[in-house]
């Protein structure tokens, strides 16, 4: 006589057996039940997932918070002074506006005819075209905050100085020297003061 048993959604034919064969089949079925029970983990016996704390700026604008978050996701920078220095320089260059041309005009990537453009005011032909070429290749919008942050952390000149930012223990003035190599600003302005301001507002959570 043939019986049928249900395991999940599968239907398996079962031939009535006796002796050793029946014992072996019983064990195989019990093993299947055991595996199924392992797949379901209750809250009581589950292992906690370790979540690394990150720096946040609760009083910052949405654009500032996005950039701070992505800097930590896309790189290994976890030093507060390093992050604050990068943030201070971006504030000085664009005030975290992606669609801004040098002089203050709010335009798209293709409409900025002269001077710098975007978050860090990409100015030279090579760096400006690099943004466009990157977004063409990786399907992002060169006028958007998201696209520019992706290019910013992947740009070769930033990659060369990245190990300095990923180190630990430097002061903001020391990190500013690395930022100068990255950006090469003409006027220093308030960028260092902005960096100090960010360092005071950032919290590790």
Q: Model features per residue range: what roles?
A:
Residues 45-67, 94-169:
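Peptidoglycan-targeting cell-wall enzymes and recognition modules
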Residues 76-80, 109, 175-180:
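Hydrophobic alpha-helical context, especially transmembrane and signal-peptide helices
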Residues 2-39, 128-205:
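Non-catalytic cell-wall polysaccharide-engagement segments
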Residues 26-83:
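N-terminal leader/targeting peptides and immediately adjacent processing regions
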Residues 5, 81, 107:
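Sparse, context-dependent recognition of short Cys/His-centered cofactor- or disulfide-binding micro-motifs
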Residues 1-3, 91-92:
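Short, flexible beta-strand-to-coil junctions
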Residues 80-97:
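Short, functionally critical alpha-helical segments immediately adjacent to catalytic or ligand/cofactor-binding
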Residues 65-69, 73, 84-87, 150, ...:
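Solvent-exposed, polar/charged alpha-helical surfaces in well-ordered, non-transmembrane soluble domains
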């Amino acid at each position: 006589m043939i019986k049928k048993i249900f395991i999940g959604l599968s239907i398996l034919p079962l031939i009535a057996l006796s002796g050793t064969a029946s014992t072996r089949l019983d064990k195989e079925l019990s093993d299947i039940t055991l595996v199924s029970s392992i797949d379901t983990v209750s809250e009581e016996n589950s292992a906690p997932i370790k979540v690394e704390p990150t720096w946040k700026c609760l009083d910052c604008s949405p654009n500032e918070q996005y950039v701070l978050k992505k800097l930590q996701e896309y790189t290994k920078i976890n030093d507060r002074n390093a992050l604050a220095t990068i943030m201070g320089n971006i504030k000085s260059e664009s005030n975290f506006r992606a669609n801004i041309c040098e002089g203050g005009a709010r335009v798209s990537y293709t409409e900025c005819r002269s001077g710098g453009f975007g978050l860090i005011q990409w100015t030279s032909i090579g760096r400006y075209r690099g943004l466009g070429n990157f977004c063409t290749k990786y399907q992002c919008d060169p006028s958007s905050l998201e696209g520019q942050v992706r290019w910013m952390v992947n740009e070769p000149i930033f990659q060369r100085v990245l190990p300095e930012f990923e180190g630990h223990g430097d002061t903001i003035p020391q990190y500013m020297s690395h930022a100068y190599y990255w950006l090469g600003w003409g006027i220093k302005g308030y960028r260092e003061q902005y960096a100090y301001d960010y360092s005071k507002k950032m919290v590790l959570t």
